[in-house]
Amino acid sequence: MNQLDQYSQPMQHLILLWFWLLDLSPPPSFHLSVKSVDLSLFSLSPLFLLLSISSLIFSRVNKFGIRRVGYAMAPKPDPTVLPDLQEKKAILGTQIEMITQAMTTLESRVTDLQQESNDHRTWVREALDKLLKRDLGDENRPKPTTNKMIATGEQHKGEVSTSLFHD
């Protein structure tokens, strides 16, 4: 078995691959002309062959618009669109600033309303205390019943006892 017969079938596929990668159409009698190719160069340096095929594959892949590894996948911006984007960015920036100012104003207003509410509660409490003191007076104001009073059955003057120990 000679070297030509040993490599003829794989070389035929390899040469067809090269034709495909180079966008060439093979000659009509390609299967007959493969045996006449000198294989000494290919048999002596398979690394060279592998490198040349891989570079051809990458160049073929790039013809289809697929980017190589390491390149950015994002498309380049259109220069006509860029001013519009910058204008929109400026508009959004001013809108964000206005919203931030409105939120600050609302927060300060909420704080003011809480303080007013606390002031009103205090005022209502004080007013009710004044009304109770004025209407009842200190002597007519009901005094709290203590546990000691309940236990001894003691009553306040003019009050009905609700004690269980009533005589």
UniProtKB/Swiss-Prot annotation:
Name the domain of life: Eukaryota
Key word Membrane present: yes
Q: Where is the composition biased (Basic and acidic residues)?
A: 154-167
**GO CC terms, sorted:** mitochondrial membrane
Keyword line: Coiled coil, Membrane, Mitochondrion, Transmembrane, Transmembrane helix
Q: What organism is the protein native to?
A: Arabidopsis thaliana (Mouse-ear cress)
- Segments traversing the membrane: 39-59
Q: Which residues form a coiled coil?
A: 92-122
Q: Which residue ranges does the record annotate as region Disordered? A: 134-167
* Major localisation: mitochondrion
| Protein name per the record | Uncharacterized mitochondrial protein AtMg00140
Q: Which cysteines are joined by disulfide bonds?
A: none
Topological relation to the membrane, as annotated: Single-pass membrane protein
Q: Where is this protein found?
A: Mitochondrion membrane
